[in-house]
């Protein structure tokens, strides 16, 4: 759970983001097109930012699109309030996971890159099933975890508790990267990855580096495979013949061995080869078997 002091830091950082957002806000990429893309980037903006990808998400998506120039890349800005109270992170996580579920169902070959900045990183944490102690939301279903190729977050408040996604999630940790600048108090004691403060991720190379990281994992993941339906076996025509033992032998439905007849394949005993007793044989895969009647 976030302590009172870190919450003040978050509020202060949020005010700075809101005040400078108009100057720094990058244009959001278009939402996912009607046709399915190879990669869909789902990004949550920071506290107080204008709806869209935000000051960090925009540059990150542009860099990732450039890194994956041989693939189709779409982006989706998570629709949530990004309020200063941080309580909107839970509903934001629910919105993020809902988008992943919707696209995954419609586009079985699409891979996802999830990410967020500041409170948007908390949105991402919760969507990955990480308990943050601030609010709750609906995570991405476990069965879709394999469709998420990479997770990249910037200025993640999870660092205030000394954690990163890599240490908090065994499922998503190996394919995640947390960026926390040396002077960024919002991400607390998380390992430092670059210079500057909470507003420097788009200008200090973090978004470019994060895009390279995500692109590498997207390429390594390949294309999701759609399970091949199990073919319905072709029914074997059922034939049943009622005849004398000797006639079954004559028709090769039975074999004779030392004066006794046996159904071909199953070796069911039919009695003496020369017998005129009438018995029923049913055709099965690989031969015939003795049945009570046809």
From Swiss-Prot:
Key words, A-Z: Disulfide bond, Hydrolase, Secreted, Serine esterase, Signal
Region (Disordered): 222-241
Signal peptide (from-to): 1-33
Class of this enzyme: hydrolase
Pro residues bias: start-end ranges: 226-236
UniProt cross-references to Gene3D superfamilies, sorted A to Z: alpha/beta hydrolase
Active site (catalytic residues): 118 (nucleophile), 184, 198 (proton donor/acceptor)
EC number: 3.1.1.74
Keyword Secreted: yes
Major site of localization recorded for this protein: secreted
UniProt subcellular location: Secreted
Catalytic function, reaction form: cutin + H2O = cutin monomers; a tetradecanoate ester + H2O = an aliphatic alcohol + tetradecanoate + H(+); hexadecanoate ester + H2O = an aliphatic alcohol + hexadecanoate + H(+); a butanoate ester + H2O = an aliphatic alcohol + butanoate + H(+)
Region (May be involved in substrate binding): 240-294
UniProt-annotated site: Transition state stabilizer, residues: 119
Use in biotech settings: Shows promising applications in improving the surface properties of natural textile fibers.
One GO CC term on file: extracellular region
pH-dependence of activity, as noted: Optimum pH is 8.
Disulfide pairings: 36-107, 180-187
GO terms assigned for molecular function: carboxylic ester hydrolase activity; cutinase activity
A Pfam family reported for this protein in Swiss-Prot or TrEMBL: Cutinase
Family: Belongs to the cutinase family.
Function text: Catalyzes the hydrolysis of cutin, a polyester that forms the structure of plant cuticle. Shows esterase activity towards p-nitrophenol-linked aliphatic esters (pNP-aliphatic esters). Can depolymerize synthetic polyesters such as poly(epsilon-caprolactone) (PCL) and poly(1,3-propylene adipate) (PPA). Exhibits some activity on poly(lactic acid) (PLA). Can bind but not hydrolyze poly(hydroxybutyrate) (PHB).
Protein name (database record): Cutinase
Organism in which the protein naturally occurs: Kineococcus radiotolerans (strain ATCC BAA-149 / DSM 14245 / SRS30216)
